Amino acid sequence: MSDFIGTKLTMNLGERSYDIIVKRGSLENLYQFARLDRRVAVVTDSGVPAQYAQMVADQCKDATIITVSQGEASKSFKILETVLRQMLDFGMGRGDLVVAVGGGVVGDLAGFAASIYMRGIDFINCPTTTLSMIDSSIGGKTAVDLGDTKNIVGAFWQPKLVIVDPDTLSTLPRRHFINGLAEAVKAGLLADPELFSIFEKEVVDDRIGEIICRSLRFKKSIVEQDETEQGMRKALNFGHTIGHGIEAVKGIKGRRTTGLFHGECVALGMLPMIESKALQKRVRGVYRRLGLPTRTAYDKEKVLAEMLHDKKAQGGQITIIKVPGLGCWRAETIPVEGLRPLLGMED
């Protein structure tokens, strides 16, 4: 783990390039990496320990903390307007800064607010969950939901800096910790057999630094080649087509609770897209080892209806990502109705 904690990666996107710092204690030393001598809006949610946002605010010359309610419901126009209003009331200008401190919801919301406030101001992402550290904190996707349709209104807005402080995972509930690992399993399946092997054989808590860094390197390489998802970045949607459909349907009975987290839904969404039965069996074994669900009860028709609203669906067609074997993938465009036989495969 020590070989990876202390890593600096650089997202190479020309004038929009930025550093990704993976380092213990980096959140309380944000001032070493970023210019904080301006007005700073620190956006967080009620599920994030308050000391993390305060830790950032204390390093700033002039800061305000904006706290939204925990959960996907905060990715709404109403909450977005509230955040923007607080930024305006704080007197923020074009040279000021938004810092997200939290998980994927906070990053999406704060990043989108930064992208549209005065036509775009600086944004720093400080993820505090495994899901956001491993995946959503880099790449520039920001969005809010429209009703039950996820991420349908948004923008590509790259952060100026990403600070990944693994120390913040110490306060993360166990189920949330495991939930985020689904995106790392995805990276292993698509392009990194060694990463997948960690999940099969190792104690993930002992290797979390390596898991984070390997996952970030994979996503970084994809985004650098296809920033706005015109081609190969679509690979990152592996598991998300069915996963988003499951996530959007209300009242799903999960293995442990009513309602599944995003990573749990992605995990379920990946299984039908794995063409090798042997690999599918190995992945189910990994899920059981980690504590991710391998099955759930859902209404197939409702899930299919939700997938019609998927951003990848056009004219009744949808591009899906299939994995024929470990470390390889392909994109395939099929009728949305063609997803029907895949929906009952996770058992």
Residue ranges and their predicted role:
Residues I5, S17, A182-A184, L279-D347:
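C-terminal charged capping/lid subdomain of soluble metabolic enzymes
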